């Protein structure tokens, strides 16, 4: 097959989950003998954070054939004006920009690649392909979160592209229901994210001088919310003097990073809570951990959580968090707690004080996440691609 991946957003230097999935998808399908190309749209130029095989053509429609496209100032003003009272309407300006300035470049990519099937990474890309260009090439629209959001925060003009898609992939069964509730006739398939199945496992049986609670993810205030973990640990630090917290991930704005530093200082945890920055070796980080804390407000799937489970770490998250509340089975491979700092503290405390419980939860975590093995997930994807390709 000749597969085109259309992830029409940033890729350069991006350490986020979507960029990771994009490069993993491209690599896996190439290894399986398929031709793979990537089209993306990035303000910046440069190297990807996650390596892309040098034999996979990558086309940036913002910087295409010697021509760079800047976002016009008048559209920026228009977008910011709308954003003050209607974020959904503000996002329509991005679609307006794409349709006005990027469509010809995308059309040229299609003519160059001539794919048998296109995997679109967002409804905006599907809109450009199916509604604006009206391509007859089958488009499979991926979802990286709860599709319920499509009907509240995404431009309404993108919705018809979902119905025009050959099939819409969702990550979890509950997400399929959300999409079908709004679009009963849309074709759907449930395929989770591929989680590496590690041969090694965190050693939860060892007696250690220092035990670690780990957080891995972007340091974002309203999404990942690592400040809640710091606050929860502040109430546990004296009770558990041989436990520390490590926060791994790129900062998402200097103001919030400073806020985290001040919070650590406020609770006198400078020698107990550490901001470690991003890492290119997540498995090595996870292998040294004892508990994985994931205080997100929402998740599309939770790749970092899945990887922690694969390393055999018990996990703690919030009941209210989408995806997390499906990956964590309360009392089986970790704990789901009510919102707030105190419930998070109690859930962590329960695991911290009982090594046998940690071992049991960690073993179950590794077992439960096996259904998301890369082999099984990519097999599902390859089957779907073959079914809908020209």
Regions found by a protein language model. Give the residues of each.
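Aromatic "clamp/platform" in nucleotide-sugar-dependent glycosyltransferases that forms part
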Residues: 278, 297
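Conserved acidic donor-binding segment of nucleotide-sugar-dependent glycosyltransferases
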Residues: 319, 329-342, 350-356
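Nucleotide-activated donor-binding/catalytic signature segment of Leloir-type glycosyltransferases, i.e.
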Residues: 258-277
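A conserved mid-protein helix/loop that constitutes part of the nucleotide-sugar donor-binding site
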Residues: 16-24, 211, 220-235, 258
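Acidic anion/phosphate-binding donor-loop and adjacent secondary structure
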Residues: 149-153, 180, 192-211, 375
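Short hydrophobic beta-strand element within catalytic cores of glycosyltransferases
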Residues: 314-318
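Glycosyltransferase donor-sugar binding loop
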Residues: 39-45, 216, 244-259
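A short, well-ordered alpha-helix in the C-terminal region of glycosyltransferases
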Residues: 285, 343, 350, 357-371, ...
